[in-house]
């Protein structure tokens, strides 16, 4: 399984946290470098970005893959301080909703959206099990449940982390995706793809296969949680058509 730590773009020691924050809001929101964009967050959260928040170039690519027409409704599962949602809304015409169970991160995301007047973004403080997937057309996942099985990556002690929750949340997402209509789009960044049902095909990849676009191509079988979770080997190793793109 690809770890969050394995995709760290820069170490916190490389991040210039002592530089003067004189860049305009507009420049920050459209920044193409993480060290620039992350200045919209409190410094403590900015230092977590390299490991825990999606890189800017990944956010841009993922948003473009998910938004197929103006107004496409995208759900970011485990949105953290809202980095993907903000970048998605400023680079596409989609509507982005982020769900985050940590209250502090959700509030930070809400404050960023309000302060910078970011359009078409909603941040929800809550658990993924309380979200109605049918309110959305596309989904983004950057290893949202991995902390439960890799305690070294723990952000804080504000929420319960248990290995059983990794399986439980992954199974829940998989079951919700099974119920979605044909042509539903999902982008995953890193992770083992446990949340993706077999009726979805991987149709594009990027960044040495770390980022994958999945599209629902087949009708949903009548899976139970256990059956669905046991049928992922060929899919994770590249089942479906894979096309690398720039």
Residue ranges and their predicted role:
Residues 1-69, 108-135:
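S-adenosyl-L-methionine
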Residues 71-80:
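Conserved class I S-adenosyl-L-methionine
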Residues 83-93:
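Conserved SAM-binding loop of SAM-dependent methyltransferases across substrates and taxa
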Residues 95-100:
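Conserved SAM-binding motif I beta-strand of class I
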Residues 104-105:
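Conserved short alpha-helix immediately C-terminal to the canonical SAM/SAH-binding motif I
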Residues 136-150:
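Short SAM/SAH-binding signature in class I
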Residues 148-223:
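C-terminal substrate-binding/active-site "lid" region of AdoMet-derived donor-dependent transferases
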């Amino acid at each position: 399984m690809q770890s969050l730590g394995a995709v760290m773009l820069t170490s916190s020691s490389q991040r210039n946290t002592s530089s003067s924050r004189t860049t305009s809001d507009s420049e920050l929101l459209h920044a193409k470098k993480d060290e620039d964009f992350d200045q919209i967050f409190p410094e403590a959260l900015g230092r977590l970005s390299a490991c825990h928040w999606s890189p800017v170039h990944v956010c841009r690519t993922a948003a473009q893959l998910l938004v197929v027409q103006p107004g496409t409704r995208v759900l970011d599962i485990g949105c953290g301080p809202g980095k993907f949602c903000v970048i998605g809304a400023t680079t596409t015409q989609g509507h982005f909703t982020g769900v985050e169970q940590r209250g502090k991160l959700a509030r930070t995301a809400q404050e960023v959206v309000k302060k910078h007047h970011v359009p078409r973004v909603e941040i929800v403080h809550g658990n993924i099990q309380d979200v109605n997937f049918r309110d959305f057309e596309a989904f983004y996942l950057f290893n949202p449940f991995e902390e439960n099985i890799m305690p070294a990556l723990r952000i804080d002690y504000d929420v319960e982390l248990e290995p059983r929750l990794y399986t439980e949340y992954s199974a829940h997402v998989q079951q919700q995706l099974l119920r979605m209509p044909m042509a539903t789009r999902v982008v995953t960044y890193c992770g083992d793809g446990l949340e993706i049902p077999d009726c979805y095909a991987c149709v594009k990849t990027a960044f040495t296969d770390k980022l994958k676009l999945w599209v629902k191509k087949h009708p949903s079988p009548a899976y139970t949680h256990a059956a669905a979770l046991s049928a992922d080997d060929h899919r994770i190793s590249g089942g479906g058509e894979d096309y690398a793109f720039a």
